[in-house]
């Protein structure tokens, strides 16, 4: 619920634009601060009376939009309220974005993760690391080399067994006294 309805805003701004009363006179008549009426008038001049309508949904702005608003504010020598009226956003929003941009740069305009962090981290599924083709080929080549070495050692072992069987005078398993 907003403090001032759309109809009231349009009525006050229309009276000012039709030169029926001054901003200070309207402020006294409706018991509203004159700077607020000035913002409504600026917004209506830039974007029409439709810009005074009350928004009931929370708008999330992209970081590019924020950057455009801040750049416009910094390059043009006009106030926060005029920039806010031009882009149909609140004055405080322009001020906060400009402040964050000056302190943190573009990173300050990026969306932040909101809410309380989880106490227990999410259990992640085990992911198998996919090997690149070059790594896979290296492992296959290594396996082939090891298999060839194993076959060579088997043949050598077989030859040694046959030599030991043919020439028994060279004992292989007997202990020396």
UniProtKB/Swiss-Prot annotation:
Residues 112-131 are annotated as: Disordered. Keywords: Transposable element. GO terms for molecular function: sequence-specific DNA binding; transposase activity. It comes from the Bacteria. GO terms for biological process: DNA transposition. Residues 113-128 have a biased composition (Basic residues). InterPro entries: Homeodomain-like_sf (IPR009057), InsJ-like_HTH (IPR055247), IS150/IS1296_orfA-like (IPR052057), Transposase_8 (IPR002514), Trp_repressor/repl_initiator (IPR010921), WH-like_DNA-bd_sf (IPR036388). PANTHER family: INSERTION ELEMENT IS150 PROTEIN INSJ. Belongs to the IS150/IS1296 orfA family. This is Insertion element IS1223 uncharacterized 20.7 kDa protein. It comes from Lactobacillus johnsonii.
């Amino acid at each position: 619920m907003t403090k001032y309805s759309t109809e009231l805003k349009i009525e006050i701004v229309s009276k000012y634009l039709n030169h029926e009363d001054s901003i200070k006179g309207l402020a006294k008549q409706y018991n509203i601060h004159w700077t607020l009426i000035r913002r409504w008038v600026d917004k209506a001049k830039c974007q029409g009376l439709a810009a005074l309508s009350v928004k009931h949904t929370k708008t999330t702005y992209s970081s590019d939009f924020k950057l455009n608003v801040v750049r416009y504010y910094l390059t043009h020598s006009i106030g926060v309220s005029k920039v806010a009226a031009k882009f149909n956003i609140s004055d405080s929003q322009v001020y906060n974005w400009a402040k964050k941009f000056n302190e943190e740069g573009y990173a300050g305009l990026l969306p932040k993760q909101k809410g309380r962090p989880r106490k227990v981290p999410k259990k992640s599924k085990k992911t198998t690391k996919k090997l690149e083709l070059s790594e896979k080929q290296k492992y296959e080549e290594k396996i082939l080399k090891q298999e060839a070495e194993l076959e060579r050692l088997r043949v050598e072992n077989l030859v040694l067994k046959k030599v030991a069987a043919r020439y028994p005078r060279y004992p292989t398993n007997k202990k020396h006294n």
